[in-house]
Amino acid sequence: MITDQKYNGVVIKLSNNFNNISLLSDDIIIAGSAVSDKLLSEFAKDNSLGGFEFLSCIPGTVGGGIKMNAGCFGREFKDILISIQAITKSGQVITIPVKEINFKYRDSKLSDDLIFLSASFKGFKKNLNLIENEMIELKKKKELAQPTRIKTSGSTFKNPLDQTDKKVWQLIKESVPAEKSFGDACISKKHCNFFVNKGDAKFEDMKRLIEFVSKSVLKKTGVKIETEIKILE
């Protein structure tokens, strides 16, 4: 989530040169860091490679997915990654194998100074119909549990795995009034870890709602929750 005022920093948007995807072998895919997660899942499906189905439900790109170890329905980027190619602050192109990446829940511990160029992934041969059916089922699960086709913050807070067995949505539900809003920023009725832009919510509206929820959960439950999304201001 980025400020709608001036941002005192540098934002790099990778061009179409980083949007390529191809097979390296029967079960290995190489994808540019600007390739969307959905496109990667579709490419894997078209080549009868399983293991990528969960990516069809994740918005964003390969680069961002690796950086935060994005995942859903029990699967994460670390489960399919072989290695990444990146460029350092000094301009050196390096390859980092997955075994050297300290993946955690929604984190990779990779340096913020790295710019990801591409990544290689390993799947396994699987019947095309089975892949399609799994993707359909995952999509149904997502649409039942999460707000879709509307403007939201996405999954906003991480589950506090080191503090409680409760999911973050459960903590929010018991700590924050469901009708709480700031401007046009409000809590989704379908999943309270998703915050909705009802029409014209500003950055500040959404930020205030996020901060209010975080403080309310801490006050009510004693659990300190951390944002899953990155906030740039």
Report residues per predicted region.
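Structural signature of FAD isoalloxazine-binding scaffolds in flavoprotein oxidoreductases
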Residues: 1-19, 67-98, 111-118
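Anion-binding (especially nucleotide phosphate/pyrophosphate-binding) glycine-rich loop
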Residues: 1-62
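Structural motif
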Residues: 9-12, 28-29, 50-53, 85, ...
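A structural signal for short hydrophobic beta-strand segments in well-ordered beta-sheet cores
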Residues: 20-24, 86, 157
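Short N-terminal helix-initiation segments at or just after the protein's N-terminus
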Residues: 28-32, 56-65, 100-102, 132-141
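A gly/ser-rich beta-alpha-beta helix-loop segment of oxidoreductase catalytic cores
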Residues: 47, 51-82, 88, 152, ...
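Phosphate/pyrophosphate- and phosphate-bearing ligand-binding catalytic cores of soluble enzymes
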Residues: 87-211, 215-216, 220-233
